[in-house]
């Protein structure tokens, strides 16, 4: 049988459409099991910000990777991980996998952000099994040894920091207690915390922005974007940075000493240059002159 180039392209597009339809068909409108993973955002074949669910069994039927992680602080000793790469999950479910970022949302409203640059560099994995066991057999959290790390978590096969800004070194994004995966437009998400005003492009402001995207944004929110675990919004942080830079720096170094309800760890390793960059960045959200 002879196919013209035009017919061949049409045939391939038909196959692609069928594949996408097949992918969307596995998503469910309602959650029927505690282990069902919520997915939302730009889902193929659905209106923007739709919410659907995918079962653990369906995730296990997707292409899997198996590895022993290196440098993952959630684990002590040799650990065998099995799961689905976030890139593969995005390709299967997202409308625009080449431009969408992945956001992992935890049961305590902590969020880990995976822009395209992170996905390409570190290939994070949605963990389905640890040492051959489902979440009920997983170890407790590494910090307090009392919290379940399921129903899902994210790990990196081998994390090698890709950049360093002053004393800040790129951090692995390895949340546990993950209950939702979002596929979001990267520009929209990060525009919510892009520096404001005349000095937005200042080098140190941009340095602070790069750090805040990876660190602060996990627990602090600006409107609907960002984590809400801390209870302190971007506006609160910006006001603190503007009116009391010393207290702002002290909060970063040791949160619990400045805010009794603080849950985030301190960052005593941040040097003056790192703190100055963060301070300059957050000050751009307040009405004032040069930060």
Segments (PLM) and residue ranges:
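Axial heme c-ligation environment in periplasmic c-type cytochrome domains
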Residues: 229-237, 253-285, 289-291
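Bacterial N-terminal signal peptides that target proteins for export
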Residues: 1-9
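Gly/Gly-Pro-rich "capping" loops immediately C-terminal to redox-active cysteine motifs
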Residues: 209, 217, 221-251
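Electrostatic cytochrome c docking/interface patches
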Residues: 187-211
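Short pre-active-site segment immediately N-terminal to redox-active cysteine/selenocysteine motifs
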Residues: 85, 204, 212-218, 223-224, ...
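Hydrophobic h-region of N-terminal signal peptides that target proteins for export
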Residues: 12-21
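Solvent-exposed, acidic/flexible segments
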Residues: 75-83, 95, 201, 205, ...
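Structured, non-membrane catalytic/scaffold regions adjacent to prosthetic-group chemistry
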Residues: 23-186, 291
